[in-house]
Regions:
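Alpha-helical transmembrane segments and their helix-start/interface "positive-inside/aromatic belt" motifs
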Residues: 1-7, 106-124, 201-211
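N-terminal signal-anchor module of multipass membrane proteins
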Residues: 1-49, 55-57
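Hydrophobic core of alpha-helical transmembrane segments in multi-pass integral membrane proteins
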Residues: 210-222
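Membrane-interface helix-loop-helix junctions at boundaries between adjacent transmembrane segments
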Residues: 71-80, 89-177
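Membrane-interfacial helix termini and the short, flexible loops that connect transmembrane helices
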Residues: 22-36, 65-70, 91-112, 189-202
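Central hydrophobic cores of alpha-helical transmembrane segments in multi-pass inner-membrane proteins
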Residues: 12-25, 60-62, 85-96
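Loop-centered beta-sheet repeat module
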Residues: 153-213
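Conserved small/polar residues in nucleotide/adenosyl-binding loops
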Residues: 230-232
Length: 232
């Protein structure tokens, strides 16, 4: 039951990453102020869904696998904190870029959206990749009966999750998720925006993002399958 729920929320989260994919394309597709405004207005009506699903996804992990949740979210907190910070940055950018008295300027907040669109999916993919490549944590269930030291899981180093980015295969899946988000963002813009000049750019960018996604994703899948065969 819990595996089904977590898988469902994970799939829904990936689907909703079209918002982040659209954010990463803001200056790639939006070559004029008017085009960037159309892109921001298009994704600005949907960003809450991704944020809510991300939080629900974490809650489902807590309910289903509390030891994993406490170890990953507590031990690797720098990685997860950066992910959450980029999503908070997204919320602030959508809300304040057009407000009166905006001292940072609209373009600054648009670059914040780009940061969210690139860093968010990249680190999410890297974090998920650790489920397959492993993480540097220790589990000592003998501490369950120790009142002076009740901690049963702890991170093995002081990097607290940032060490996951030193594994190239974590980055491979991270970039695969990033390009997948950009694919979904392009498809969303094609179906949501009616502009004769912008849509052709979206179609060309769709092909540009599909090729590296297929290469990276297939490479990660093949690598993971080969590792599983070696350990049989």
């Amino acid at each position: 039951y819990w595996w089904f729920l977590v898988s469902l929320l994970g799939a829904l989260l990936v689907f909703l990453l079209f918002v982040q994919g659209g954010n990463s394309l803001l200056f790639t597709l939006g070559r004029t102020h008017e085009e960037r405004t159309m892109l921001v207005n298009s994704t600005g009506r949907k960003w809450e869904f991704t944020f809510t699903t991300l939080v629900t996804f974490g809650g489902a992990f807590f309910a289903s696998f509390p030891l994993f949740y406490s170890t990953s979210f507590g031990g690797a907190y720098w990685l997860w904190m950066i992910i959450l910070f980029t999503f908070v940055l997204q919320a602030v950018s959508y809300e304040f870029q057009s407000k009166l008295g905006n001292i940072l300027g609209k373009r600054t907040y648009q670059w914040f959206l780009v940061i969210n669109g690139v860093v968010g999916p990249l680190l999410l993919g890297g974090a998920v990749a650790t489920f397959f490549t492993g993480s540097n944590f220790l589990v000592n269930k003998g501490n369950m009966g120790n009142e002076l030291m009740p901690v049963i899981s702890s991170w093995a180093n002081g990097w607290h999750g940032l060490d996951a980015l030193t594994n190239p295969w974590n980055l491979v899946l991270g970039f695969a998720v990033l390009f997948l988000a950009r694919i979904l963002g392009n498809l969303y813009f094609i179906n949501n925006i009616r502009d004769k000049e912008l849509i052709p750019h979206c179609r060309c960018q769709l092909i540009t993002d599909t090729i590296p996604f297929l290469i990276l994703f297939l490479a990660f899948v093949i690598h993971t399958l080969l590792l599983s065969l070696i350990h049989i």
